[in-house]
Regions:
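Hydrophobic alpha-helical connector segments
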Residues: 1-36, 63
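Residues at helix-coil transition
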Residues: 9, 16-17, 68, 122-129
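A generic helix-loop boundary/linker signal
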Residues: 5, 32, 53, 103, ...
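Hydrophobic alpha-helical bundle segments that form small-molecule/ligand-binding pockets
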Residues: 36-85, 127-129
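Soluble or luminal CAZymes and related metallo-dependent hydrolases
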Residues: 3, 34, 38, 108-116
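C-terminal peripheral helix-coil segments that are non-catalytic and often amphipathic
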Residues: 76-130
Length: 130
């Protein structure tokens, strides 16, 4: 569990440090080949923790993709448009307190990333328990 949480933290930190990396990773299918040693290390840690090789690779891929997708969304909410407003300001103007999704301050921080990571971890635990 902590391995996957830490991996999400590292992916998020990397996306924060290098603006635009998030979308670049999604646009170039071979991007992951540049971090093969890192991937192997994470997968090996997960295998040592009890996951099968395929499960471990899937778990990291799921966490990584989720983290990157969340970062893309948060970056869009932070971005200032031609009208001088941020994405979150535009969303606030287009929603009400009765909308399905009501903007919250956390949306421009990490959004719901941590909840999603915990959801994935719980699901993986159930699969491993079988």
């Amino acid at each position: 569990q902590d391995i996957l949480r830490h991996a999400a933290e590292e992916v998020w930190a990397c996306c924060e440090k290098y603006p635009g990396l998030d979308i670049t990773i999604f646009q170039f299918p071979s991007a992951f080949t540049h971090i093969e040693d890192y991937l192997r290390n994470i997968v090996n840690q997960l295998v040592k923790a009890g996951l099968g090789q395929e499960q471990a690779a899937f778990a990291f891929d799921f966490i990584g993709d989720t983290t990157i997708a969340c970062h893309i969304g948060v970056a869009a909410l932070r971005q200032v448009g031609d009208d001088g407003r941020t994405g979150i300001e535009v969303v606030r103007d287009r929603t009400t307190h009765t909308s399905v999704y009501v903007p919250e301050p956390s949306w421009t921080d990490r959004g719901t990333l941590d909840r999603k990571v915990e959801f994935i971890i719980r699901g993986m635990e159930k699969e491993v328990e079988g």
